[in-house]
């Protein structure tokens, strides 16, 4: 019989090697482009190029290729040649190459933005494709920034793209952000949002901030003109339990696409000096009823800790500590229960599953519909917490010998459920399954779907 | 003021509605014989329509950090926050801040 595990390992290994080779090729191509730029500058090939004060180059004319390529926006009266030149001489930093960053980068590269910086510490995976539209199946496992660069250069080879593949933090943020004109917050977590805000205030960089979840999106521009900063609006971070990420709450790709495209638009307006920039206002998009709402938010807070005349925060702080949350949207395993109140998947499969027991899956019905264990009954966490489940199981719950097992996707919500149920039924054996259904796939049944 | 009702509209956006029976828009008819400010309104909401985990909406006497309150599409901080006195046909909107991308 063929050893399917060995084949699977070989496949994974090959895929990873191919991804690494692609990334290496990509870096070489960037080196070549950099070198060619240096050569053409040294030999004075381009007479429209002049060194600017930052040691970079400043274009003063459009090439014929530029004119043909950008003709449809060049003829806009408020945009014109000067607008295109400003874009060509601009540099934009995009933080997060996910659902917002991909479309934002795509429109900026297409519009002729001269230099794009892409920050993402993460790698491309299958669950990204529905909304992170620059990545491709062939680039699974590659750094998201590198993957996005490949797609963007196919779109516009004149765009100079710099990848930053590390997590943005208090030590590297100032150094990275300093060289860009505008910053796009396309991140997925609260800590990074405060970090970007503070750094942009200190460096006086406009910050185009987008966010999305489920079918809702929000957009505004901070640190622009007399408008407020993120801290003026949100002086105190939200409690961690009130924060939902896209991995837990879900999100539609067309919603992140809508907000990401508008982030590119606001960045272009800031660079070109076009129209009314969305500062001091918040755009709220409710995709489920296709409602856009533009609300007036407060101006600068006179005692803002970072952007007021007498700031308390004058250098970057520890933002994960400040927010009590990690600067990623990865799983943060909860540890609410003692080990005797928990069960690992093997123990459940080998012992408990063979006996009478009540297996309650506390995920949302839409998740339960995707996949479920045999014998599991679905009681969403909210119905556990408000006790509406009691009626449904009144008969079974009379038997104090019947073990109650709580289950969820990753073993966090199931702990919250155990805490609640054991208070009501102190005589029962009530436990949850460590690592939830993800652990089931990894340790018991590899054919069980992961989402 | 002959009317005994104060009619206002409450709206919820970006997930805040999940704490209020998943209803995004409500028309309220409050007791018009007394004055209502936002502080009283929050107490009324807590007692009458807040169905899920109150700590995800309130913190002490006010809304928790990360929820914006808009009165007629203007940030309540420009209008006196908890002390703002509700007027007939006011629209009060509660928005959860989103962080995902």
Curated annotation (Swiss-Prot), chain A:
Q: Which cofactor does it need?
A: Zn(2+)
Return the InterPro entries for the record. MOCS3/Uba4 (IPR028885), Rhodanese-like_dom (IPR001763), Rhodanese-like_dom_sf (IPR036873), ThiF/MoeB/HesA (IPR045886), ThiF_NAD_FAD-bd (IPR000594), Ubiquitin-activating_enz (IPR035985)
**Biochemical pathway:** tRNA modification; 5-methoxycarbonylmethyl-2-thiouridine-tRNA biosynthesis; Cofactor biosynthesis; molybdopterin biosynthesis
- Output this protein's name: Adenylyltransferase and sulfurtransferase MOCS3
The answer to whether the entry has keyword Transferase is: yes
What GO biological process terms does the UniProt entry carry, in alphabetical order?
Answer: Mo-molybdopterin cofactor biosynthetic process; protein urmylation; tRNA wobble position uridine thiolation
Q: Which family does it belong to?
A: In the N-terminal section; belongs to the HesA/MoeB/ThiF family. UBA4 subfamily.
- Give the residues the record marks as binding ATP: 99, 120, 127-131, 144, 188-189
| Cellular location(s) | Cytoplasm, Cytosol
Protein purpose: Plays a central role in 2-thiolation of mcm(5)S(2)U at tRNA wobble positions of cytosolic tRNA(Lys), tRNA(Glu) and tRNA(Gln). Also essential during biosynthesis of the molybdenum cofactor. Acts by mediating the C-terminal thiocarboxylation of sulfur carriers URM1 and MOCS2A. Its N-terminus first activates URM1 and MOCS2A as acyl-adenylates (-COAMP), then the persulfide sulfur on the catalytic cysteine is transferred to URM1 and MOCS2A to form thiocarboxylation (-COSH) of their C-terminus.
Write down the chemical reaction(s) this protein catalyses: [molybdopterin-synthase sulfur-carrier protein]-C-terminal Gly-Gly + ATP + H(+) = [molybdopterin-synthase sulfur-carrier protein]-C-terminal Gly-Gly-AMP + diphosphate; [molybdopterin-synthase sulfur-carrier protein]-C-terminal Gly-Gly-AMP + S-sulfanyl-L-cysteinyl-[cysteine desulfurase] + AH2 = [molybdopterin-synthase sulfur-carrier protein]-C-terminal-Gly-aminoethanethioate + L-cysteinyl-[cysteine desulfurase] + A + AMP + 2 H(+)
Q: Which NCBIfam families match?
A: PRK05690.1
Q: Which residues form the Rhodanese domain?
A: 353-449
Q: What sort of enzyme, by top EC class, is this?
A: transferase
EC number(s) for this protein? Answer: 2.7.7.80, 2.8.1.11
Q: How is the cofactor bound?
A: Binds 1 zinc ion per subunit.
Q: Which UniProt keywords apply?
A: ATP-binding, Cytoplasm, Metal-binding, Molybdenum cofactor biosynthesis, Multifunctional enzyme, Nucleotide-binding, Nucleotidyltransferase, Phosphoprotein, Transferase, tRNA processing, Zinc
The primary location reported for this protein is cytoplasm
A molecular function (GO) held by this record is:
thiosulfate-cyanide sulfurtransferase activity
Q: Which residues carry this modification: Phosphothreonine?
A: 60
Q: Where is the active site?
A: 246, 408
UniProtKB/Swiss-Prot annotation, chain B:
- Respond yes or no to whether keyword tRNA processing is given for this record: yes
Taxonomic source organism: Drosophila ananassae (Fruit fly)
> How the protein assembles, per its UniProt entry?
Interacts with cer.
List the taxonomic lineage: Eukaryota, Metazoa, Ecdysozoa, Arthropoda, Hexapoda
Q: What is its main location?
A: cytoplasm
Q: Which residues carry this modification: 1-thioglycine?
A: 101
Q: What is this protein called?
A: Ubiquitin-related modifier 1 homolog
Does the keyword Lipid metabolism belong to this entry? no
Where in the sequence is the signal peptide annotated?
A: none
Q: How is it modified after translation?
A: C-terminal thiocarboxylation occurs in 2 steps, it is first acyl-adenylated (-COAMP) via the hesA/moeB/thiF part of the MOCS3 homolog, then thiocarboxylated (-COSH) via the rhodanese domain of the MOCS3 homolog.
**Functional description taken from the UniProt entry:** Acts as a sulfur carrier required for 2-thiolation of mcm(5)S(2)U at tRNA wobble positions of cytosolic tRNA(Lys), tRNA(Glu) and tRNA(Gln). Serves as sulfur donor in tRNA 2-thiolation reaction by being thiocarboxylated (-COSH) at its C-terminus by MOCS3. The sulfur is then transferred to tRNA to form 2-thiolation of mcm(5)S(2)U. Also acts as a ubiquitin-like protein (UBL) that is covalently conjugated via an isopeptide bond to lysine residues of target proteins such as Prx2/Jafrac1, Ciao1, Eip71CD and GILT1.
Q: Where is this cross-link: Glycyl lysine isopeptide (Gly-Lys) (interchain with K-? in acceptor proteins)?
A: 101
């Amino acid at each position: 019989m063929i050893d399917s595990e060995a084949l699977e390992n070989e496949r994974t290994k090959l895929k990873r090697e191919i991804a690494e080779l692609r990334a290496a090729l990509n870096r070489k191509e960037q080196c070549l482009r950099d070198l060619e730029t240096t050569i053409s500058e040294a030999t004075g090939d381009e007479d429209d190029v002049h060194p600017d004060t930052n040691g970079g180059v400043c274009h003063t004319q459009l090439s014929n290729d530029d004119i043909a390529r950008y003709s449809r926006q060049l003829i806009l009266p408020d945009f014109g040649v000067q607008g295109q030149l400003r874009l060509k001489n601009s540099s934009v930093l995009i933080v997060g190459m996910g659902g917002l960053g991909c479309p934002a980068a795509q429109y900026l590269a297409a519009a002729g933005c001269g230099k794009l910086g892409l920050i993402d510490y993460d790698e491309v995976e299958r669950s990204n494709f529905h909304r992170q539209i620059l990545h491709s199946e062939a680039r699974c496992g590659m750094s998201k920034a590198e993957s996005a660069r490949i797609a963007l250069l196919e779109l516009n080879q004149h765009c100079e793209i710099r990848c930053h593949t590390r997590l943005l933090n208090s030590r590297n943020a100032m150094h990275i952000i300093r060289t860009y004109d505008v910053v796009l917050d396309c991140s997925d977590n609260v800590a990074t949002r405060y970090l970007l805000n503070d750094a942009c205030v200190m460096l006086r960089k406009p910050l185009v901030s987008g966010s999305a979840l489920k079918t809702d999106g929000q957009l505004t521009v901070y640190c622009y003109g007399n408008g407020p900063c993120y801290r003026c609006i949100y002086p105190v971070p939200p409690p961690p339990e009130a924060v939902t990420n896209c991995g837990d709450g879900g999100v539609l790709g067309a919603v992140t696409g809508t907000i990401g495209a508008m982030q590119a638009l606001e960045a272009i307006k800031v660079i070109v000096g076009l129209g009314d920039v969305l500062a001091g206002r918040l755009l709220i998009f409710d995709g489920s009823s296709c409602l856009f709402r533009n609300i007036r938010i407060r101006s600068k807070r006179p005692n803002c800790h970072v952007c007021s005349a007498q700031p308390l925060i004058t250098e970057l702080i520890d933002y994960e500590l400040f927010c009590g949350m990690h600067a990623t949207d990865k799983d943060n395993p909860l540890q609410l229960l003692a080990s005797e109140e928990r069960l690992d998947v093997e123990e459940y499969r080998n012992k408990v599953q063979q006996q009478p027991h009540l297996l309650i899956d506390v995920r949302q019905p839409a998740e339960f519909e995707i996949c479920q264990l045999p014998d599991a009954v679905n009681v969403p966490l909210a119905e556990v917490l408000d006790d509406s489940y009691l009626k449904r199981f009144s008969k079974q719950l009379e038997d104090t010998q019947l073990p109650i097992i709580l289950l969820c996707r990753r073993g966090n919500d199931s702990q919250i459920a155990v805490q609640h149920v054991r208070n009501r039924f102190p005589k029962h054996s009530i436990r949850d399954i460590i690592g939830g259904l993800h652990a089931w796939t990894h340790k018991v049944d590899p054919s069980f779907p992961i989402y | 003021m002959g009317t005994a009702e104060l009619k206002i509209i409450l709206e919820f956006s970006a997930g805040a509605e999940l704490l209020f029976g998943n209803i995004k828009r409500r028309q309220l008819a409050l007791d018009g014989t007394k004055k209502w400010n936002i502080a009283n309104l929050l107490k009324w909401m807590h007692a009458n329509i807040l169905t899920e985990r109150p700590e995800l909406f309130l913190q002490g006497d006010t809304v928790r950090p990360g929820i914006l309150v808009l009165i007629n599409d203007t940030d309540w901080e420009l209008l006196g926050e908890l002390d703002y006195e509700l007027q007939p046909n006011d629209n009060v909107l509660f928005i959860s801040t989103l962080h995902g991308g």
